[in-house]
Amino acid sequence: MKYFMGFDTSCYTTSIAVLDETGCLVADKRKILSVKSGARGMAQSEMVFQHTRNLPDLLDQIIADLGTPIELKAIGVSAFPRSQPDSYMPAFLVGEGYARGLAVMNGIGIWRLSHQESHIYAGIWSAGGPNKDRFLAVHASGGTTEVVLVEKNDDVSHITLLGGSKDLNAGQFVDRVGVALHLPFPAGRHLEALALHHHANAIDIPFSVKGLQASFSGPASHVFRMLAKGYAPESVAAGVELCIARSLAKLIIAAIEKTGVTDILLVGGVMSNRYIRETIQKKVSKASFMTKLHFPDSKYSPDNAVGAAYFALQRGT
């Protein structure tokens, strides 16, 4: 049996994953970076430091879980944020360095891909599709909120940006509200827990989507005013989820109308939120009954290395 390893060292998570040659996940280790209480992020230098410290521990855990030596066939690594010539982020160099070292030592191939492509591959691996040559992908996270057109032959070959947020990303919106509510950072799962069972009392947050451009800075300012007036945190959290779901659903509908493509893959940390997923599904399905939305398991929506490993499997066999 041959194995394929993936690395992803993103803004807030160190990840390593291993797939066997059948595509079965045999190891998946992640460690969320530690952000100081009350902070709204961290410097790239701190990310690099924490990734450098985390990777040896995760590799030790991978080896311990596997139990016996394995034959690596290829390695995939997220080496830059997007598939653009000027796309660069120091944090990704940590994972790329480890991946290149392992590849050289084992005499195997290494496949570089963007962090966004890794999300797309993880989504396809988990959701079992889309299985079309052209599909839409929604990538909603703390670092990105984009709707893209993916056109492929045997693999993801070309990604065209259609639209997205022009200011704050959806995940940034969540995190900034989370910090204001004194939730741990990143705030996604904590805000989701706070909002649970409170959507009937969600505050109405005006959302702004014009064509394929959304804005979350205005909604964020509205939320801060509501908090200053003493609105219940639970109702605020529920309102944030609803605002994001409405905005993303409207972006998706606009992308469908522009391209005629009705298969949509939804990835990124924001897509791990159950209420947001369900609300998008309802609103998009109501607007266009021909659409097919593909959601990966919520475990594979946030940052992970499974997509990079799956990319290596696709390229290295």
Residue ranges: model-predicted function:
Residues S10-F49, V156-L161, F295:
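Short glycine-rich, Thr/Ser-proximal phosphate-binding strand/loop in the N-terminal lobe
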Residues A193-I264, V270-S285, L313-G316:
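A contiguous, well-structured pocket-lining segment that forms one wall/lid of small-molecule binding clefts
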Residues L58-K73, L251-T262:
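Phosphate/pyrophosphate-binding loops at sites that engage ATP/ADP/AMP, CoA/4′-phosphopantetheine
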Residues P69-F80, G260-M271, H294:
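Short glycine-rich phosphate-binding loop at a beta-alpha junction
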Residues I63-A99:
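Short beta-strand-loop/turn "lid" adjacent to the catalytic site in phosphate-handling enzymes
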